[in-house]
Amino acid sequence: MKILMQQRKIESLTDNIGIVFGPSTAEYKITIITNPCCYWCKELHKEIHNLLWSRSNIKIQIIFNVPSSSSNMELEVSRAILGSAASPSTYYASNEILDFWFEKSYNNLSLFKKRFIFPKTILEAQDNKINEMYFWCNSEKLYTTPSIFINGFLMPDEYELKEVLYMI
């Protein structure tokens, strides 16, 4: 953890944006700034499950760095994932949608839309959340994806997400 304390720290809180997986009382919070159309984010997604299942004291927060004026694919996938989090009892689980996108339909929007169908009102209702995340990323000067923070500190570039267990 000492190496993390020497890294850049997030200036503002992220508690009310994005999607969180894991217990709310977790000792460690891993914040991942991502984009559904980022290849490196796709690769990183494979490690998220391993991390969540390996320790009960970790929660993972996903924040999308996607402008609402972005490409159709980025926006539609972000809306669907956020829409599932907004109404989990009615629709699909957010982790199910993330898994399907990154593991089975990456960059294939038509396949994704055949599998996950949401009312237009649910999808459009996510635009404020998408804008809020995008503006937060800009205010923190986070322009690249993925970016990973552990308890608010930037994970050094020379480490991979799977190595987080050794850092905490």
Task: Write out the residue ranges for each language-model feature.
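Structural alpha/beta surface segment adjacent to cysteine/selenocysteine redox centers
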Residues: T31, P36, K42-E124, W136-Y143, ...
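Internal catalytic domains of large membrane-associated glycosyltransferases
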Residues: N131-Y134, T145, N151-F153
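N-terminal targeting signals for export/organelle localization
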Residues: M1-I10
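Generic recognition of flexible, low-complexity loop/linker segments
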Residues: I17-V20, M133-N138
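Structural motif
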Residues: Y28-K29, S147
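Non-catalytic, surface beta->alpha helical segment in thiol-disulfide oxidoreductase systems
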Residues: I150-I168
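A short beta-strand-turn-helix
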Residues: E11-Y28, W53
